[in-house]
């Protein structure tokens, strides 16, 4: 039942994107995310590495820039031929990750199903993450924090190195996602 509730809220919230042909197109998404991800998808479709991005200033190296997320694992979605589908899947994946990881973290803390659902929905609809969604590189980095916290706490309680490794992997995702300051916040 909790999964169904979360799914229903998610579908209602993203109904315009899922069913009405709308897309995410505001603030940094409009100026950076959409054009850079489109360029990344086109270059990868040609079987090349995205060394140079010609559409920023008079051209700039793309791979060393953090915010395009060239080496960020979820960017693999841009290998999908249908760019708009990949773009939506990319953004929706991060919202789903946020909702499910907040729910999982709350349940790990032995909070009630209702409290966990409330925290999960608040993370989706609340001001912090809602405002970060327009600054996509910070958003896609910040959503990993609940998983990092849960893995770190499991490592501290159980002492298993696998949880430490998972926390480190998720921190690396924060860096590769283009928001390295989020990894600093996570470590603190």
Residue ranges and their predicted role:
Residues 1-4:
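N-terminal membrane topogenic signal
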Residues 6-9, 99-108, 113-188:
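Membrane-embedded helix bundles of polyisoprenyl
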Residues 9-102, 121-146:
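Membrane-interface coil-to-helix junctions
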């Amino acid at each position: 039942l909790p999964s169904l509730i979360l799914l229903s809220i998610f579908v209602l919230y993203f109904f315009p994107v899922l069913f009405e042909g709308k897309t995410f197109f505001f603030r940094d998404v409009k100026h950076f995310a959409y054009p850079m991800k489109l360029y990344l998808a086109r270059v990868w479709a040609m079987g090349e590495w995205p060394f140079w991005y010609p559409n920023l200033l008079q051209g700039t190296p793309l791979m060393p820039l953090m915010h395009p997320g060239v080496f960020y694992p979820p960017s693999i979605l841009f290998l999908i031929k249908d760019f708009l589908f990949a773009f939506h899947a990319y953004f929706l994946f991060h919202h789903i990750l946020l909702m499910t990881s907040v729910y999982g973290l709350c349940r790990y803390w032995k909070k009630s199903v209702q409290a966990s659902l409330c925290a999960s929905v608040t993370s989706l609809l609340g001001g912090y993450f809602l405002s970060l969604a327009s600054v996509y590189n910070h958003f896609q980095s910040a959503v990993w924090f609940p998983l990092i916290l849960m893995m770190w706490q499991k490592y501290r309680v159980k002492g298993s190195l696998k949880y430490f490794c998972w926390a480190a992997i998720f921190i690396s995702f924060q860096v590769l996602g283009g928001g390295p300051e989020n990894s600093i916040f996570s470590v603190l």
